[in-house]
């Protein structure tokens, strides 16, 4: 039985032997006076209670030794030997009980916890049904019943276990008897084994003694030999020794053997195909098997059926050594001869062919083991399985493994490279866990070199990896289009010669190779400028994909670093993407591996450049940020700059560096210039796209930098009448009759102004019907406008910051040009002589001899800062941004300079009689008058007192006031049936003044009832022609020239208020601000009156 459960807790002991017995054995106390060494025990009255004898400790044993020897010997003759006690597999019953109780408690606790988690629905408050015995049934829900059932099952199972424990407890009270039975059975088994062992030993001895038998000596024959020197009873055969062979005889015999061998091989013997190459010489035939061995055979009889005999063998491959003479050679000789006797030449070849193949594999195994212990340690694993050599290389590389198997192919498959189906050494190549063709492996069966085979395998593996990487890289547009070079060098025998040269940028190159021993990819750059470690490798990818990803990553890093270093030289600042709050993957393609953002101090802060690099190409992007709020600060971007997510991102160039040309001194500087221009053009095109009411070409996706780094132009469809209302300029009715500009405007980038640090844009256009010689009117110093001499083309120069739209300035300038051309046409129609032309002024000459000059100013004012207004807001805005106000200016000494305010008001009034034609007509009409007034004002000394005042109510009405006499006259233009005339009337001052009769009589006599050159009195006024009004004013002034001695009573200060030196430019004509006052000063002959008059001269003359 396997074990006994004892009721006592201290049961135990050594498994075998009575060396150190326990204090009790099998539950029986030891017997005193026993000797464990001799198996002797004392006789006691309680001997019936012990089993298998008893044992004592060592102390008891020593005590017994000191006892009487006679007693011990006597007792030893009577007592049986001590039996070994078996205690292996015994354990206390109390431990089983404790374990069972503990397990029961644990399971009960778990059950209570589980049952507590079960939710039992509450019992209904109604009357409960009673059981047959009259007791209530309680809660009869399914959950409650399930809980009760589980408790009942647990109690039943544990009850069964404790019943088993009870049975074991009752049985263990008789365990002592069972233990004694186990000890007896063990004793019997040991005795049986000793008996069987004795029999076996005797049989072996009997068998071995057979070889030790020696025959009895033949004393009789020995005595005869010693006495006579011979044995008479031994028969003789009569053989005669052969005669010694001479050289000639030996040669004849060898030649005869050669003939016999040749005849046999040709006529009778079946020579296998591998033995077809042979030569017969020196009485033997030498079979030659290329790359394997040379076999020498000979014959022992002339009979054709006799066998060949082995003579010698030589291996034809290296490394190999000759078979040493001795036991090995003899065994080979015997084995070959037996094969020749039984299987002939074919069997001999099969034997030796297999021997050679095995020898070659063993030689390769030894070489591989030496490599694994030498330079290839830790990277090479070698194993020989029967006759198959397994060589695993690149053991430290993660991922699928690669190995080479060199074994013997049976040759039964027709596809195998074997001769007539013979076995041969074959290669099986497992590359990255998959079997591939091994025919390209360099294997020399004659000169065996495991290192050459291994290097060939690694070279082919490396070539496969690099060629796969080459194919994957060549699919990217950078290499497929020839923008970057990609060249691979492969080898079948030398892994160090396998390289992949990749051009990262125009100045940086990368060489990819694989370290032969460890299989690690090596990437080296030229020049070596990449300092960051390449640690982010993905071991889950195939090796070729890993190389491609690393090459792509390094190429993009190199390209971005080179761009950043060149961009910083041009003043570009690298912008941290975090400060832009930019989700890069949302606005840019997913294949981009590296990117960088740039900004320049002269750009608007809502535009940046992005340089992106991928294996499909390097690109420049123009990124517009939102909100588009320009900033005056030129500080770098930060998180608090107020710029949020990008609004748009547009690719503008597909290369970082332009193709080098003979006229390029600094290619990247030219690229920076083009980037500056394309950003400016993109900003304007984006502004037009947002307006949605002005068409343009090319569209935004096609607005990119050209191959020659030329910034493309934008063609804008311009029609002033179809512009949004916010951009339209309200022209005067006379100027807005027709358009002067064709509807196509070409906007071109023309560089950067070094002083203003702004982009220069030029708008080119054509005139529909250009005036004659209009190009000569534009001054060469005016850089804002150029008109082609003798042609119909013009150009407008604009300055704007990069990233800021110039559309408002362009539309304003175009409408200014149309306004200037309309004014020019009107002047020529009015027979005026144009002198100059610009976007803000038109100069012309007038007068009888064109001796007077004037300038019409074109002033456009804006109601707000339109450069920061959202174009989407401008589309719906009805209020125009531009307010047109024309002005006219006269240079000194033009007499019309005193009428400048009146003419300006007349130009800007909305009345039907207010127009440029009216003003030009009034210039001719009022010129004689203004010249006459200038004559009245001639006062070189500027010391004479104030004598006359002229107030211009408007360009057609004047008031002449003599303050000292308090007399006013009104001079105005009146239309007669055939012409215009000036009419002079009294405006007040002479009625009811008797003291001024002399003045009245003078006026009537000289003016009202008189007639002069170009004028005529009308009794109550005077009328004068346009060109002779000066004569009238001269005669009028003469009427007052002789009145200096006439006293004027009740003289009061002048009622006229001081007039400002420059009139107010208003739309109406108030008397105080819109009039022009002209003062004439005449000589005063009375010093006292001159002083008094001078003290009261507080009227300011407008000049």
Curated annotation (Swiss-Prot):
Swiss-Prot/TrEMBL keywords: Activator, Nucleus, Transcription, Transcription regulation
Recorded GO MF terms: transcription coregulator activity
GO annotation, biological process: regulation of transcription by RNA polymerase II
Region (Disordered) residue spans: 1-63, 120-140, 1054-1103
Principal location listed in the UniProt entry: nucleus
Feature: compositional bias, Polar residues: 1073-1103
GO cellular component: core mediator complex; mediator complex
Taxonomy, superkingdom: Eukaryota
Subcellular location: Nucleus
Classification via Pfam families: Med14
InterPro entries given in the database record: Med14_N, Mediator_Med14
Nucleus is among the record's keywords: yes
Name the UniProt record assigns to this protein: Mediator of RNA polymerase II transcription subunit 14
Name of the gene encoding the protein in the UniProt record: rgr1
